[in-house]
C-alpha cells in the first residue's frame, strides 16, 4: 500500500533527509587513498547518532553497519571492513538515517584520487540519469515514467541498468511501496500523488546488467566484473517540481 504523508510527517522526512545527506557528505570527504571502508563507516555512524538519529540500515534493514560501501564492481550492500581504498577506485556510499520515526535514504559514487576517464564518465552519467528520471516524479505521471527516462539516458551512453534491485517508497518504513525500477516502458504502474515520498536510485553498469551476490550474503557485484555506480536521493512529490529531501550542493 502506498502511504501518502501528512504535512507534519513531511516535515519529519525533511529533517531525516538533512541528516542523511550530511552523513553522505561526511563519507564523500573521507574517500581518499589509504582510508579503509571501516573508517568511513565509523564516521558516518558517529555523525548520524550525534545528529539525534539512528542508522536505519541497522535498525530497520538488518545490515551490520551504518553505511553500505561498495567499491568498483560492487553495486550495492558492500560491507565495510579492512579494505583499503586505492588511487583510481570508485566508491559508492549508501546511507540511511531514522529520525523520530521517519527515514532518509541516499547514495553517491565518488572517485578516489585520480580516476580513469571511463570511471568519471560513469559517475557523471549515473548522477544525471537520476535527474532525467525525476523530471517525471510529478503528480499525474506513472512510476514507470521515471525508470524509462533513467534507462533511456544511461543506455544512450552504452551502459546498462541493474534490474534485480530498484528504488522504492520511503517513510516510516525504510522500504515502502511502490517499487521504482530503473528501466521499462512508460505509462505503467501507480500514478504519483502529492506527498508521496520515494527514493529514486539508478544503479548503472559499464557492462551487462546481470549481478551476483557474494558469499557474505550482502554484497551485490556485476556478474562480468565491470564497474558500477549508484546515485540516490529521497524525494517528496509536490504540486510542482519534486523536492529532494536529501539534497547536497556538493554531491
Task: Go through the PLM ranges and name each one.
Residues 1-251:
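Active-site neighborhoods and metal-handling regions in enzymes and metal-associated proteins
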Amino acid at each position: 500500500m502506498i502511504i501518502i504523508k501528512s504535512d507534519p510527517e513531511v516535515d519529519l522526512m525533511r529533517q531525516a533527509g538533512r541528516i542523511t545527506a550530511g552523513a553522505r557528505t561526511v563519507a564523500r570527504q573521507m574517500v581518499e587513498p589509504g582510508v579503509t571502508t571501516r573508517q568511513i563507516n565509523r564516521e558516518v555512524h558517529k555523525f548520524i547518532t550525534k545528529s539525534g538519529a539512528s542508522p536505519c540500515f541497522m535498525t530497520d534493514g538488518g545490515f551490520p553497519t551504518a553505511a553500505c560501501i561498495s567499491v568498483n564492481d560492487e553495486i550495492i550492500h558492500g560491507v565495510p571492513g579492512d579494505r583499503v581504498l586505492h588511487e583510481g577506485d570508485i566508491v559508492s556510499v549508501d546511507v540511511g538515517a531514522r529520525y523520530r520515526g521517519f527515514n532518509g535514504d541516499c547514495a553517491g559514487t565518488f572517485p578516489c584520487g585520480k580516476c580513469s576517464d571511463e570511471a568519471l564518465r560513469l559517475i557523471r552519467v549515473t548522477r544525471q540519469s537520476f535527474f532525467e528520471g525525476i523530471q517525471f516524479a510529478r503528480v499525474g505521471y506513472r512510476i514507470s515514467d521515471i525508470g524509462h527516462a533513467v534507462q533511456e539516458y544511461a543506455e544512450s551512453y552504452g551502459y546498462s541498468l541493474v534490474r534485480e534491485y530498484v528504488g522504492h517508497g520511503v517513510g516510516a518504513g525504510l522500504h515502502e511501496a511502490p517499487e521504482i525500477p530503473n528501466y521499462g516502458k512508460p505509462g505503467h504502474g501507480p500514478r504519483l500523488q502529492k506527498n508521496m515520498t520515494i527514493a529514486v536510485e539508478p544503479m548503472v553498469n559499464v557492462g551487462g546488467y546481470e549481478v551476483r551476490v557474494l558469499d557474505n550474503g550482502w554484497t551485490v557485484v556485476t556478474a562480468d566484473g565491470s564497474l558500477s555506480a549508484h546515485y540516490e536521493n529521497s524525494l517528496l512529490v509536490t504540486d510542482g517540481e519534486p523536492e529532494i529531501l536529501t539534497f547536497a550542493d556538493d554531491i
